[in-house]
């Protein structure tokens, strides 16, 4: 809650230390906060001309197998199967843990309102935490599943890289 002006909200969002995006319930990409002069410096590369575009158009250059994963994330959140999907994009350079969090959003009446995405390099946060607490990471022999895990979320591949899921529809909107 608060009484921010539109300009204050814009400054607040632009100051966030991560990339934020929003796609509405009609699968239109409407907002991103980090307008870099060079989109290649972004983890989720976006340019101003994409605002207002359909998600299928924005991701249209992806190979079909990767597009199926984008469709799966959208469908999973749209259908309420999960509240969020978190991924780590494989193949990131050393010193980068490219993390994407896709979160379903809802209108006051409880109906689906779209997806917000938070993208950031988790490595500096992890390094800071380990330094501040004196802890360190140690190897293990199997996957780590924290208590209260979240469904079948795939934390080892990006939305564009996870296994094929075909039951989601990222090309039609709520009004189609």
Language model features with spans:
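Sensory modules in modular signal-transduction proteins
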Residues: 1-35
């Amino acid at each position: 809650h608060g009484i921010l002006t539109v300009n204050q909200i814009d400054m607040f969002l632009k100051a966030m230390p991560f990339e934020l995006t929003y796609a509405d319930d009609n699968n239109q990409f409407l907002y991103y906060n980090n307008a870099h002069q060079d989109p290649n410096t972004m983890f989720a590369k976006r340019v101003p001309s994409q605002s207002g575009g359909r998600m299928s158009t924005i991701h249209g250059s992806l190979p079909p197998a990767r597009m199926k994963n984008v469709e799966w994330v959208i469908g999973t959140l749209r259908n309420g199967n999960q509240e969020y999907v978190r991924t780590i994009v494989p193949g990131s350079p050393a010193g980068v843990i490219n993390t994407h969090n896709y979160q379903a959003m809802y209108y006051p009446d409880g109906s689906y309102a779209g997806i917000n995405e938070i993208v950031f390099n988790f490595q500096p946060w992890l390094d800071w935490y380990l330094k501040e607490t004196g802890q360190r990471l140690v190897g293990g022999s199997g996957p780590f599943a924290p208590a209260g895990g979240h469904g079948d979320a795939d934390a080892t591949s990006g939305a564009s890289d996870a296994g094929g899921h075909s039951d989601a529809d990222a090309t039609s909107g709520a009004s189609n």
